[in-house]
Swiss-Prot record:
The protein's role, per its UniProt record: Catalyzes the initial step of the lipid cycle reactions in the biosynthesis of the cell wall peptidoglycan: transfers peptidoglycan precursor phospho-MurNAc-pentapeptide from UDP-MurNAc-pentapeptide onto the lipid carrier undecaprenyl phosphate, yielding undecaprenyl-pyrophosphoryl-MurNAc-pentapeptide, known as lipid I.
Name recorded for this polypeptide: Phospho-N-acetylmuramoyl-pentapeptide-transferase
Principal subcellular localization: membrane
Catalytic reaction list: UDP-N-acetyl-alpha-D-muramoyl-L-alanyl-gamma-D-glutamyl-meso-2,6-diaminopimeloyl-D-alanyl-D-alanine + di-trans,octa-cis-undecaprenyl phosphate = di-trans,octa-cis-undecaprenyl diphospho-N-acetyl-alpha-D-muramoyl-L-alanyl-D-glutamyl-meso-2,6-diaminopimeloyl-D-alanyl-D-alanine + UMP
Gene label: mraY
Required cofactor names: Mg(2+)
């Protein structure tokens, strides 16, 4: 909202200095600082409120060291992250930008699903929370909305080349400048480590013959649904020990922030020879607010945690990361900058699959990991959770750097 106020001051009243709000970098810095302050200063008040309302974590007996000490710790702390993210976004972002609208919808949508899940667990004393089928329906619903908007909305365009112009002389010694390519709808995405690193989902339907491109949504929307569901569930599984989900998510989002900034800037995208996505740079403001909120939340969530984010936070985090990756056409790189989420999810899938297979084959279930998700495996091996979290953060940073390197490494 302040963006529009200062825009009025600048363009209508011609007030000196107010034009600084036109710069994404300036607004991103303000969004980060405000979200950090909100999550640290007001976070304590939210925690005290949750404690007074007896919104405490119910700990399942898993045989893990120190787990009983966590009983009664306030949960639903994801409300802090949501609040500290949205307030700066409403103040400093261009709210008519389609990408900002999508991210706000994603935050509120996934936050609501997570909140209902936590509410049922705490106040209805149902340890299972919201039934899995309803979570999936919510995730699929968001996927359909995001996929449809990105595919059909005319404001979402992509320029798949560098935007360079060719200047040459004709035989008549006339200078000719080729016009810049037209920005158009596209379902292209980025493939890492490949020279001509773009793949169009529409190509999957090339067997349909001429005009197959108009049916690309049949592939694109299911892909969006899968990514949102997978990443949000991966974030949910990662939220098992103090500071793990918030810290690794902050690293992932920082990597996405770099992708978003360069993809939305025609100069940087031209230099790096990457896909230019008009208007996507505005997401940098949202990302800055989101990172500030996550870091501020870590102030209280690091070991020993004073608050847990609950599904209110973890599902929201996963949904936001997924939508950011899809919007900036870096969803394939999720396996790198969200490598921790992938490892946690894979450990659960492998554990359950192997247990069922061995039970059917040998009459008794066997396990590959001492416990899944993966962080519990290391807890069972005797590692202190703070050491596990620190090492997972280090791995997350390495994977994020590797994903950023793909901008030039082909």
């Amino acid at each position: 909202m302040l963006y529009y106020l200062f825009e009025y001051f600048d363009k209508t009243l011609d007030v000196p200095g107010t034009g600084v709000f036109q710069y994404i970098t300036f607004r991103s810095a303000l969004a980060f600082m405000l979200s950090l302050l909100l999550s640290t200063i007001y976070g304590k008040r939210v925690i005290n409120f949750l404690r007074r309302q007896q919104v405490g974590e119910t700990v399942r007996e898993l045989g893990l060291a120190g787990q009983n000490e966590k009983a009664g710790t306030p949960t639903m702390g994801g409300l802090i992250i949501i609040f500290a993210t949205l307030v700066p976004v409403f103040l400093f972002a261009r709210l008519h930008n389609i990408y900002i609208v999508l991210l706000i919808v994603t935050t509120l949508w996934m936050g609501t699903i997570g909140f209902v899940d936590d509410y049922i667990k705490i106040f209805k004393k149902d340890k299972q929370g919201l039934k899995g089928i309803f979570k999936v329906i919510g995730q699929v619903g968001l996927g359909i909305i995001v996929g449809a908007v990105l595919y059909f909305n005319p404001a979402v365009t992509v320029r798949t080349d560098t935007g360079k112009t060719d200047v040459f002389k004709t035989a008549a010694n006339t200078t000719v400048v080729l016009p810049a390519p037209v920005e158009e709808k596209s379902t292209a995405t980025t493939i890492p480590f490949v020279k001509n690193n773009e793949f169009d989902y529409a190509e999957v339907l090339s067997f349909m013959g001429d005009g197959y491109e108009k049916w690309a949504w049949l592939v694109f929307i299911p892909v969006v649904i899968f990514i949102i569901t997978a990443v949000s569930n991966g974030a949910n599984l990662t939220d098992g020990i103090d500071g793990l989900a918030a810290g690794t998510s902050a690293v992932s989002v920082l990597a996405l922030g770099i992708f978003t900034f360069v993809s939305g800037n025609i100069i940087f995208s031209n230099y790096l020879n990457i896909m230019y996505i008009p208007n996507s740079g505005e997401m940098t403001v949202f990302i800055s607010a989101f990172v500030g909120a996550l870091i501020g939340f870590l102030w209280y969530n690091s070991f020993p945690a004073s608050v847990f984010m609950g599904d209110t936070g973890s599902l929201t985090i996963g949904g936001i990361i997924a939508v950011l990756a899809i919007a900036v056409r870096k969803e394939i790189l999720i396996v790198l900058f969200c490598g921790i989420f992938l490892a946690e999810s894979a450990s659960v899938i492998i554990q359950v699959t192997y247990f069922k297979y061995t039970k059917k084959r040998f009459g008794e279930g066997r396990r590959i990991f001492l416990m899944s998700p993966l962080h519990h495996h290391y807890q069972k091996k005797g590692y202190h959770e703070s050491k596990i979290v620190t090492r997972f953060w280090i791995v997350a940073v390495m994977l994020a750097i590797l994903s950023i390197v793909t901008l030039k490494l082909r």
